[in-house]
Swiss-Prot record:
<dbReference type="InterPro" id="IPR033132">
    <property type="entry name" value="Glyco_hydro_1_N_CS"/>
</dbReference>
<keyword id="KW-0378">Hydrolase</keyword>
<feature type="active site" description="Nucleophile">
    <location>
        <position position="422"/>
    </location>
</feature>
<feature type="binding site">
    <location>
        <position position="158"/>
    </location>
    <ligand>
        <name>a beta-D-glucoside</name>
    </ligand>
</feature>
<feature type="binding site">
    <location>
        <position position="487"/>
    </location>
    <ligand>
        <name>a beta-D-glucoside</name>
    </ligand>
</feature>
<dbReference type="GO" id="GO:0005975">
    <property type="term" value="P:carbohydrate metabolic process"/>
</dbReference>
<feature type="signal peptide">
    <location>
        <begin position="1"/>
        <end position="18"/>
    </location>
</feature>
<feature type="binding site">
    <location>
        <position position="422"/>
    </location>
    <ligand>
        <name>a beta-D-glucoside</name>
    </ligand>
</feature>
<feature type="active site" description="Proton donor">
    <location>
        <position position="204"/>
    </location>
</feature>
<feature type="glycosylation site" description="N-linked (GlcNAc...) asparagine">
    <location>
        <position position="371"/>
    </location>
</feature>
<dbReference type="InterPro" id="IPR017853">
    <property type="entry name" value="Glycoside_hydrolase_SF"/>
</dbReference>
<protein>
    <recommendedName>
        <fullName>Non-cyanogenic beta-glucosidase</fullName>
        <ecNumber>3.2.1.21</ecNumber>
    </recommendedName>
</protein>
<comment type="similarity">
    <text>Belongs to the glycosyl hydrolase 1 family.</text>
</comment>
<keyword id="KW-0325">Glycoprotein</keyword>
<feature type="binding site">
    <location>
        <position position="471"/>
    </location>
    <ligand>
        <name>a beta-D-glucoside</name>
    </ligand>
</feature>
<feature type="binding site">
    <location>
        <begin position="203"/>
        <end position="204"/>
    </location>
    <ligand>
        <name>a beta-D-glucoside</name>
    </ligand>
</feature>
<feature type="glycosylation site" description="N-linked (GlcNAc...) asparagine">
    <location>
        <position position="335"/>
    </location>
</feature>
Amino acid sequence: MDFIVAIFALFVISSFTITSTNAVEASTLLDIGNLSRSSFPRGFIFGAGSSAYQFEGAVNEGGRGPSIWDTFTHKYPEKIRDGSNADITVDQYHRYKEDVGIMKDQNMDSYRFSISWPRILPKGKLSGGINHEGIKYYNNLINELLANGIQPFVTLFHWDLPQVLEDEYGGFLNSGVINDFRDYTDLCFKEFGDRVRYWSTLNEPWVFSNSGYALGTNAPGRCSASNVAKPGDSGTGPYIVTHNQILAHAEAVHVYKTKYQAYQKGKIGITLVSNWLMPLDDNSIPDIKAAERSLDFQFGLFMEQLTTGDYSKSMRRIVKNRLPKFSKFESSLVNGSFDFIGINYYSSSYISNAPSHGNAKPSYSTNPMTNISFEKHGIPLGPRAASIWIYVYPYMFIQEDFEIFCYILKINITILQFSITENGMNEFNDATLPVEEALLNTYRIDYYYRHLYYIRSAIRAGSNVKGFYAWSFLDCNEWFAGFTVRFGLNFVD
């Protein structure tokens, strides 16, 4: 397998200007000047990301146990667009030194990757035994990164729950997962924390809850529909899973702060995904409230808990007794349980009000009472990438829009530390294209350039953005999309 450097000249060149591109409609083209490393504050981190399931491969090697994604892709290949799995994917387990060499050549400051829970604890629990071969692999990866001047940014859970815990008690549907996650993260802090300065407990917990338990499109594939992998309840399951995820996060943060942070000197946070959700009709009060409601049910679903210790009032009003409750102790544990927030931002959408249907079966997907669209008056909000959910819209980081976003969520943007932990666009994986043509990355360069330009603007306006991680470092397995799309900065044949 050959890795071919496709782009991310942003890491290595001094400056450049884009004044035109085929990626954006002519009417939206802007000459937005030069960007270089010196355009950003000293110490600003540039990196790229990955996850264990999507990159490592070697699913049956080195003592690793199966994850829910292994089961999902093997048992229900029809749920994956091309019927593929990540048994091999880009084989980082065996090729990590080569990968780190590419990172060094591209002048990356940091590499964001996740640890595979079932590679460390194949039985899911400490009592089931520690896989020291898995510990050795991550030690080797971390040491190789540091030897090449690259800072590891470690995610502790990127959706690959040990299958044994799903079988034993239903995984994140059961509060038993909280203590097991705490023990797993404690082990990671102990083994790797002397060299890891940035920890993220969970990656996109909203996607894990929504896609895995409301829509059934992701592992473990539970929802109310009849054509899914496992039966579930789309009206209660996602809320239970969300509740247990946030408590697991808070327990992990508590362990780190009380046992390790004082002498390891690292920081710990969580990585959340959000679109910039705009009212379809700027003059419609119902649409404006719908956009705020939609934000409450996505980014705010977790951010509200992290900053207040409870769910938002709008969620309590709509979901009622289907929404779990925190005890006073749990609320105090959750409130403020982060040093930083990672934001994964890809795109935006228009939101309009959708009155509830009284007789409809409750579902997380319909609870916000909104409709989502990507165009207004027949005009798309931006060019579309390969995935139907990515329309190029970098303007969330314009000062006014970003301040509105933070105001709605009651976030002080000058105090809260956060990084853009994922940002990117994909293209279709067209095997008929010559490599030379596949490497023409005008669209992707333009996408990153514009987002970085507006992120710089947000920083200059007072936002405390500390870093930027492109998604993804390499083309890789993209969950239910399999290998049908490419997000990578680097082309993989």
